[in-house]
Amino acid sequence: RNKSINILYQEFIKIMKQYFTKQENNKSLILFFTGWGMDQNTLSINKKDFDTCICFDYTDIDFEKSHYKNYQAIDVYGWSMGVWAASYTLQNCNLPIRKSVAINGTIFPIEKERGIDPIIFQKTIDLLNEQSLLKFNKRMCGSKENFQFFIKHSSLRSIESLKQELISIQSMVKKDMTSTFQWDKAIIGTRDFIFPTKNQLKAWRKIKYEIIDEAHFLDFNKYVD
């Protein structure tokens, strides 16, 4: 592996994984908080004049902000559970954030009305195995074509790693980890069966939002602008 790109990706460190997929000494950065169970393979964003860093694995929510000290502008994107993770970790970071966009997620990740139903979340933990994960991923993608796209970029993490991440998220959310972080815009998919569309609409009533004809998982390049 190229150490200049992968220096932040160290499995043995108890910290949120932060992985540069593009690091070319640009002055602007796309900081993307991806969803549960994902890793650096989940998405590939290559925007001109921007470096790209992918955040994932919220088993530990500690965040190393010093890696971003040389950037003049940071565009934050959160997808799915990454919306909550970004909200919590960035609220006191004092980074030069230019804009923030939430995609198919909310700041209330485990909540019946504005997030994922707590009963469904618990069942996901209790029943998690290879078969149930496959079912979840198909539901997340919504169509055969989208699923085929997803599996080309799917996570290489173990089932046990994914389960521990869910348990940790559940524990942290129960502590009422509220945030003062402000999102500029929410993007809401009409075919999202993970964070139900109606729940997202309830969660984002007070900010600008865009409704799109997409499933929970999508081609993120279309919405990184």
Label each region the model flagged.
Residues 214-224:
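Catalytic histidine-centered segment of alpha/beta-hydrolase-like enzymes
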Residues 130-170:
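Conserved alpha/beta-hydrolase catalytic His-Asp/Glu region
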